[in-house]
Amino acid sequence: MNQTLLSDFGTPVERVERALEALRNGRGVMVLDDENRENEGDMIFAAETMTVEQMALTIRHGSGIVCLCLTEERRQQLELPMMVTNNSSQFQTAFTVTIEAAQGVTTGVSASDRLTTIRAAVADNAKPSDLNRPGHVFPLRAQPGGVLSRRGHTEATIDLVSMAGFKPAGVLCELTNDDGSMAHAPEVILFAKQHDMTVLTIEDLVAYRQAHEQKAS
């Protein structure tokens, strides 16, 4: 990643720490993955704090595929089968079946309805019957070990919200341009500045975790 593009958001360490602070303050962050991977920017929010306004922003400026990142433990708690048994996607993106809140929604498509579904799925006492299948929210199962085991947006989301002090559940959606094409670093940075969001890379997060875990060992 061209570090000059990201210089307005601080050093790699500062970018991670600013992202954690933003999440703690109920704001979203933008996460860029590696240029030789998807080379895309995702909007990321803590599931516990996401607002209807933030969901509306996500739907308006994103791909429309609003994903709920979960751990394997939560997937099992909710009894969510994986979408396919043989995952042949390029980056092994681990979708489960889609979900909808069993109560409190209409068609399930609106920002309010999608947020109701997310809140139902991440509630401490959530049970399988709280969710209908299929629906308009796309759960993603994160790999154990986070970005140190897979350098994906799913794992970055779980790492960031956990490090910020929230339960390991976060919402992501890929940022798109007005013409429907995928947003890359220059467009992601412009969007972040327009919406007072900080930007970091998965590479930043990998280095941050490695440094802190080496200190702890």
Curated annotation (Swiss-Prot):
One protein family per Pfam: DHBP_synthase
InterPro entries per the UniProt record, alphabetical: DHBP_synth_RibB-like_a/b_dom, DHBP_synthase_RibB
Domain of life: Bacteria
Residues binding D-ribulose 5-phosphate, per UniProt: 37-38, 42, 150-154, 174
Chain sites annotated for binding Mg(2+) 1: 38
Signal peptide as annotated in the record: none
Job of this protein: Catalyzes the conversion of D-ribulose 5-phosphate to formate and 3,4-dihydroxy-2-butanone 4-phosphate.
Top enzyme class: lyase
Full protein name: 3,4-dihydroxy-2-butanone 4-phosphate synthase
BP term (GO), one: riboflavin biosynthetic process
Molecular functions per Gene Ontology: 3,4-dihydroxy-2-butanone-4-phosphate synthase activity; magnesium ion binding; manganese ion binding
Metabolic or biological pathway, per its Swiss-Prot or TrEMBL entry: Cofactor biosynthesis; riboflavin biosynthesis; 2-hydroxy-3-oxobutyl phosphate from D-ribulose 5-phosphate: step 1/1
GO cellular component: cytosol
Catalysed reactions, semicolon-separated: D-ribulose 5-phosphate = (2S)-2-hydroxy-3-oxobutyl phosphate + formate + H(+)
Subunit record text: Homodimer.
Cofactor annotation remark: Binds 2 divalent metal cations per subunit. Magnesium or manganese.
EC number: 4.1.99.12
Protein family (similarity comment): Belongs to the DHBP synthase family.
Site (Essential for catalytic activity): 136, 174
Binding site for Mg(2+) 2: 38, 153
NCBIfam families cross-referenced by the UniProt entry: ribB
Cross-referenced HAMAP family: RibB (MF_00180)
Keywords from the named record: Lyase, Magnesium, Manganese, Metal-binding, Riboflavin biosynthesis
Cofactor(s) recorded in Swiss-Prot or TrEMBL: Mg(2+); Mn(2+)
